[in-house]
């Protein structure tokens, strides 16, 4: 995929896979906005990458962010929503289930609100 000159939003773009994705897209010439719940904890975000704060579980904030950043061509969701529920499904407690579903809602919010503001033939990547 050619990304030079494309506009990209990377949720979870300040650490881990999201940060690596933001760096790669920027190095290939994309205009990148890295979105994080906690941008103050951002890793080594490259120069030229814009940082924005937003929690993927907050629908109002997501809607506002997408309106402000539109239109864009590439949408990446690598946000975990914070806590992680790890373990066999039947051995998790109710908090673990809630954490898992919160993460799912985060992905749903990215896709639901993001597609309204994407350019035609845009690309979505869910990590």
Would you name each region that the model predicts?
Residues 11, 72-81, 126:
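Rossmann-fold scaffold of SDR-type NAD(P)-dependent oxidoreductases
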Residues 14, 22:
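N-terminal Rossmann NAD(P)H-binding glycine-rich loop of SDR-like oxidoreductase domains
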Residues 1-9:
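Flexible N-terminal pre-Rossmann segment of NAD(P)-dependent oxidoreductases
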Residues 57-71:
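Conserved Rossmann-fold cofactor-binding substructure of NAD(P)-dependent oxidoreductases
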Residues 35-40, 56:
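N-terminal Rossmann-fold cofactor-binding loop
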Residues 80-95:
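Conserved mid-core segment of classical short-chain dehydrogenase/reductases
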Residues 46-60:
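Rossmann-fold cofactor-recognition segment
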Residues 76, 100, 110-114:
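Hydrophobic positions on the long internal alpha-helix
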């Amino acid at each position: 995929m050619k990304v030079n000159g494309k506009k990209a939003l990377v949720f979870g773009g300040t650490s881990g896979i999201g940060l690596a994705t933001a760096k790669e897209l920027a190095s290939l010439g994309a205009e990148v906005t890295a979105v994080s719940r906690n941008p103050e904890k951002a890793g080594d975000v490259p120069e030229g990458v814009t940082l924005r704060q937003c929690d993927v579980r907050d629908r109002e904030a997501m809607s506002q962010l997408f309106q402000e950043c539109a239109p864009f061509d590439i949408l990446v969701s690598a946000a975990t929503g914070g806590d992680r529920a790890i373990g066999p499904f039947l051995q998790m407690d109710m908090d673990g289930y809630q954490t898992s579903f919160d993460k799912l809602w985060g992905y749903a919010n990215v896709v639901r609100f993001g597609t309204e503001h994407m350019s035609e033939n845009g690309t979505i990547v869910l990590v």
